[in-house]
Every structure is written in structure tokens, then in C-alpha cells.
């Protein structure tokens, strides 16, 4: 006997509910299989509709990027450990491309090429995602480089100036100080408002930790994004790392900010791309690099530039390593032709304890001169001439040739200028301090001093020029020429400082 208070629905109610419910929608997914495995790559079959650069998800939790499209098979670059992937495991399409978190939440963070934390902090959340690959801005959206980017290094700011929006290559053999120049440039942006991005490609973990420590010590980590793809990571992460760095930079530039991107280094990036291409059986070319290696770096560096009004800028400092000072190797020549100039670090100068070891005879800035402060231009031009004459005369002097008074004076002046260009690591100098030291050296105030004495004299001049109120910072900031009155003020201040240290007799009155 059925009671009216029975809470159970009747059969008729159940039938009506089923009929009124929307029809079920089957979940359709394309599933492939792993057919081959290599070091950092996989060959996948069964995904005929996959697109180039699409992300694929493997059943093991590793993701990969479609690199090669061939009939019946896909060449996939893995973004995780290949040892975690098994033969025959399922692979699914995602319909999306590789993206990275961008925006203010990334500042002060150390992340990998996918934006995953490397600093033992929480994941970057509440941030928009941007594809790591993007088209470079067209010509009409760019404006000429016209504003300086101060590196804080005398040898660079005076003779090889860099402008906001420029692509300036840092090139040299191993252990010549390439990373030091890049890090010192970042440290010099502390009070400029420039957002900095340091991208480590294939670097050892201890080397990256050293850079992070320097940024923390210089109170610049909060203004910097560190993207690290170490030598222990999957090759695919090292490949996409510089593109991810550019995407993060573009997000800030779109907000009108000036951004500095250091890519350390593109030699490792090129080797990684060669390794992946050979594993995927792409035809090798010169030095076994694939034929599109130039395009790989060109499309990356073309994303930097000075953009339209209110759109900010991206300054790129790519680093490349040479072997035995061979500037004509394949990758160095490619990057020299892509960029707007190069800062060449010479092993010969390193052996003479000249740091930074910038060889001004080979280094050049093709567009930065237009952005250089006028006060520096005359000093920088004379600097190159003086050093060039000094190096030529120095070669003759080694043969013991008898030298006349004028030649000895030129050698003394050249040695003083070379000493003036020495600078310790992690000690970027303000522009007016650089100008004061260089003017003092060019006018002979440091002639006859050895390296130690010249270092002490430069410190005294820096302290004195900081304490003096000569209007030098305003002259540089206002892009004014260095007047005779300003030059006289520099020399008077420098002579007084040297006199107090007991080294005033080195001045050339």
C-alpha cells in the first residue's frame, strides 16, 4: 500500500526528468601514441590534425611542442624529462600554444621557461598568459633610438653607448666577463625605472645563483624577472626560454615601460636548437646547424626596439661566446649582422688585468651614438683616438726603440686613459662621475700613475665630484654640451682631490 507521504519520486516523474534533461555530449579528444623516444624529443603517431607549435599532453604528465609535421607522424620537443615518457603511452592534443605568465606579478621572481617557480615560492597566479612566440612589431610601429641606456661602465657609456630600444651584442671568449657586463648594466638601472629581465640559457645552477645573489645585493631583484633554463633542464625549455623572456618584456613595454632583456647566452641556445634538429633528422647545414638558425635568432631579436609614443621600449643584450677569438664563426657572424653593434671582450686585455676587457678597436655601436649625451661625445671620440695611438706606439716601444719626448708623453697619456677605463665588478658609476674621471685622464691628471695609484686617484675624484655642486648631472640629463666652464670645474675639483691625497703632482698643468 503506497502512502501519499512517500518522498520517493514516481516512475512517471523519473521518466519525465530523463526526457526533459539535455542530451549528453560525448567528450571527443584526439589521442595519439608515442612511437619513438630520444633525448628531449618524441615521435608521435595518430594525431593527423595537430598543428605546428601546438602543445601536446603526454599521459605521464610531460608536455611537448609540435616541431615537425610529417605524413603519419609528428616530431615533438619535450618540455620535461624524456625518461618520464614511455613508449606507446597516450598523447592528447590541447589546441593551445606554449604560454607564459606575464605582468607585475612576475617581478622579483625566479621562474623557468614556462613560468613555474624556481625560488621555492608559490606559483605565479592571477597573471595573464602570453604566447612565447609572437610576431615582431612592423616598421611603422617603431621609432628611432634616441634615449640613452646608462650601463654604469665607463668603457661602454663613453665609447660604445647603448640606447633604449637597441640590440647590442656582448661577445667574447669564455671567462672574459660577458655576464659581468650584463649584470652590472642591470644593477645600474636601480633608480631609472627600467624593468630588467635576465634569461639564463643552459647555464650551471651555481652561475645562476651567483647572478641572483648579485641582484639581491644590489637591491635590484624586485625590479627584475629571472628566467632560468639550466643545463640540467630539458632542451625544449632552453629553446623556448629567450622567447618567453621577450613575451614578458612585451607585456611591460605595452604599458609604456622601458625594458632591458639580457639573453645569456645565445651560443647555448643555438647548440640546443642544433641538438633538437639533428635528433628530429632535420637536414644539417654549416657547422651542423639547421638552415633556419639565422631566422630562429632574427625573429627573436626583432621583437626588441623603441616603439611608438607611449608604447615603451625593449633593449636586448644578447650574449654570445666565441672560441679562440674567432669572430667569423657561424653563430657570431649571424648575431653581429642581426644586432645594432657589439661589445667585444678581448682575452688579451683580460691577461693584462684590464676589466672590463672591452676592446674599443673592435667594439661598435651603430645607433647608440645618436642617443649618447652630448657631454660624452667629444670625450668618447678622443678616447678612441688616444687608445688607438697608444696601442700602436706600445708595440714599437717593446722593441726597445729610442723614443722621443712626444712619443713618451703619448705613451704616458694612453696608459693613464687605459687605467681610467678599469672598473671593478658590481660598481656601476653615475654618468657625471664617469665624465669627471675621463676628463681628468684625458687632460693628463693621471699620467705617470701605476694601476693602484690610478685606482685610488679615481676614487678620490669620484668622491670630490659627488660632493661638489657643479651642475654636471643637470648638464648630462639636459643633453647639453660640456662647456669650458664645466670642464674647468671638473679639472679644478679633480686637482684639489688629488692634492689632498698627495698625488697632485701627476697633473698636467
From Swiss-Prot:
E.C. number(s) listed in UniProt: 7.1.2.2
Compartments where located: Cell inner membrane
Transmembrane segments: none
Main localisation: membrane
Molecular function via GO: ADP binding; ATP binding; proton-transporting ATP synthase activity, rotational mechanism
Membrane topology recorded in Swiss-Prot or TrEMBL: Peripheral membrane protein
Taxonomic superkingdom: Bacteria
Catalytic activities: ATP + H2O + 4 H(+)(in) = ADP + phosphate + 5 H(+)(out)
Keywords, ordered alphabetically: ATP synthesis, ATP-binding, Cell inner membrane, Cell membrane, CF(1), Hydrogen ion transport, Ion transport, Membrane, Nucleotide-binding, Translocase, Transport
Residues that bind ATP: 172-179
Record site: Required for activity: 363
InterPro entries listed in its UniProt record: ATP_synth_asu-like_sf (IPR023366), ATP_synth_asu_C (IPR000793), ATP_synth_asu_C_sf (IPR038376), ATP_synth_F1_a_nt-bd_dom (IPR033732), ATP_synth_F1_asu (IPR005294), ATPase_F1/V1/A1_a/bsu_N (IPR004100), ATPase_F1/V1/A1_a/bsu_N_sf (IPR036121), ATPase_F1/V1/A1_a/bsu_nucl-bd (IPR000194)
One CC-aspect GO term: proton-transporting ATP synthase complex
Annotated SUPFAM superfamilies: C-terminal domain of alpha and beta subunits of F1 ATP synthase (SSF47917), N-terminal domain of alpha and beta subunits of F1 ATP synthase (SSF50615), P-loop containing nucleoside triphosphate hydrolases (SSF52540)
Cysteine-cysteine disulfides: none
Keyword Ion transport: yes
Keyword check for Cell membrane: yes
Pfam families the record matches: ATP-synt_ab, ATP-synt_ab_C, ATP-synt_ab_N
EC category: translocase
The protein's role, per its UniProt record: Produces ATP from ADP in the presence of a proton gradient across the membrane. The alpha chain is a regulatory subunit.
Family per record: Belongs to the ATPase alpha/beta chains family.
Known partners and oligomeric status: F-type ATPases have 2 components, CF(1) - the catalytic core - and CF(0) - the membrane proton channel. CF(1) has five subunits: alpha(3), beta(3), gamma(1), delta(1), epsilon(1). CF(0) has four main subunits: a(1), b(1), b'(1) and c(9-12).
Name assigned to this protein: ATP synthase subunit alpha 1
Amino acid at each position: 500500500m503506497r502512502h501519499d507521504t512517500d518522498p520517493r519520486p514516481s516512475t512517471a516523474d523519473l521518466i519525465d526528468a530523463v526526457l526533459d534533461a539535455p542530451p549528453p555530449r560525448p567528450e571527443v579528444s584526439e589521442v595519439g601514441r608515442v612511437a619513438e623516444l630520444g633525448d628531449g624529443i618524441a615521435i608521435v603517431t595518430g594525431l593527423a590534425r595537430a598543428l605546428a607549435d601546438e602543445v601536446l599532453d603526454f599521459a605521464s604528465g610531460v608536455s611537448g611542442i609540435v616541431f615537425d609535421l610529417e605524413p603519419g607522424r609528428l616530431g615533438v620537443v619535450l618540455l620535461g624529462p624524456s625518461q618520464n615518457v614511455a613508449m606507446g603511452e597516450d598523447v592528447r592534443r590541447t589546441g593551445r600554444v606554449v604560454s607564459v605568465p606575464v605582468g607585475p606579478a612576475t617581478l622579483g621572481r625566479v621562474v623557468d621557461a614556462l613560468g613555474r617557480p624556481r625560488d621555492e615560492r608559490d606559483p605565479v597566479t592571477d597573471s595573464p598568459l602570453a604566447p612565447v612566440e609572437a610576431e615582431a612589431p612592423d616598421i611603422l610601429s617603431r621609432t628611432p633610438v634616441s634615449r640613452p641606456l646608462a650601463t654604469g661602465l665607463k668603457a661602454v657609456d663613453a665609447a660604445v653607448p647603448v640606447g633604449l630600444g637597441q640590440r647590442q651584442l656582448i661577445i667574447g671568449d669564455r671567462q672574459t666577463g660577458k655576464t659581468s657586463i650584463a649584470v652590472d648594466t642591470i644593477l645600474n638601472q636601480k633608480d631609472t625605472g627600467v624593468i630588467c629581465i635576465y634569461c639564463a640559457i643552459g647555464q650551471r645552477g651555481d652561475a645562476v645563483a651567483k647572478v641572483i645573489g648579485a641582484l639581491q645585493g644590489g637591491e635590484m631583484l624586485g625590479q627584475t624577472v629571472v628566467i632560468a633554463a639550466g643545463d640540467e633542464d630539458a632542451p625544449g625549455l632552453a629553446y623556448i626560454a629567450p622567447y618567453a623572456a621577450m613575451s614578458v618584456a612585451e607585456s611591460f613595454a605595452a604599458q609604456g615601460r622601458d625594458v632591458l632583456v639580457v639573453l645569456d647566452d645565445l651560443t647555448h641556445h643555438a647548440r640546443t636548437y642544433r641538438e633538437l634538429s639533428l635528433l628530429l633528422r632535420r637536414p644539417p647545414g654549416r657547422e651542423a646547424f639547421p638552415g633556419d638558425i639565422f631566422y630562429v635568432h632574427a625573429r627573436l631579436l626583432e621583437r626588441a626596439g623603441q616603439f611608438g609614443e607611449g608604447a615603451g621600449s625593449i633593449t636586448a643584450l644578447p650574449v654570445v661566446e666565441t672560441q679562440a677569438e674567432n669572430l667569423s664563426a657561424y653563430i657570431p657572424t649571424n648575431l653581429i649582422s642581426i644586432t645594432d653593434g657589439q661589445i667585444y671582450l678581448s682575452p688579451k686585455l683580460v691577461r693584462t688585468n684590464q676589466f672590463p676587457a672591452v676592446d674599443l678597436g673592435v667594439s661598435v655601436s651603430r645607433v647608440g651614438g645618436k642617443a649618447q649625451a652630448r657631454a660624452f661625445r667629444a670625450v668618447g671620440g678622443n678616447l678612441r683616438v688616444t687608445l688607438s695611438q697608444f696601442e700602436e706606439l706600445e708595440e714599437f716601444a717593446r722593441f726597445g726603440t729610442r723614443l722621443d719626448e712626444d712619443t713618451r708623453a703619448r705613451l704616458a697619456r694612453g696608459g693613464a686613459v687605459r687605467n681610467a677605463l678599469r672598473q671593478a665588478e658590481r660598481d656601476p658609476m653615475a654618468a657625471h662621475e664617469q665624465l669627471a674621471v675621463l676628463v681628468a685622464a684625458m687632460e693628463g691628471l693621471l699620467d705617470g700613475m701605476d694601476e693602484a695609484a690610478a685606482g685610488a686617484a679615481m676614487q678620490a675624484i669620484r668622491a670630490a665630484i659627488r660632493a661638489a655642486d657643479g651642475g654636471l648631472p643637470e648638464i648630462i640629463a639636459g643633453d647639453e654640451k660640456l662647456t669650458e666652464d664645466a670642464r674647468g670645474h671638473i679639472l679644478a675639483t679633480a686637482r684639489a682631490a688629488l692634492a689632498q691625497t698627495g698625488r697632485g703632482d701627476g697633473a698636467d698643468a
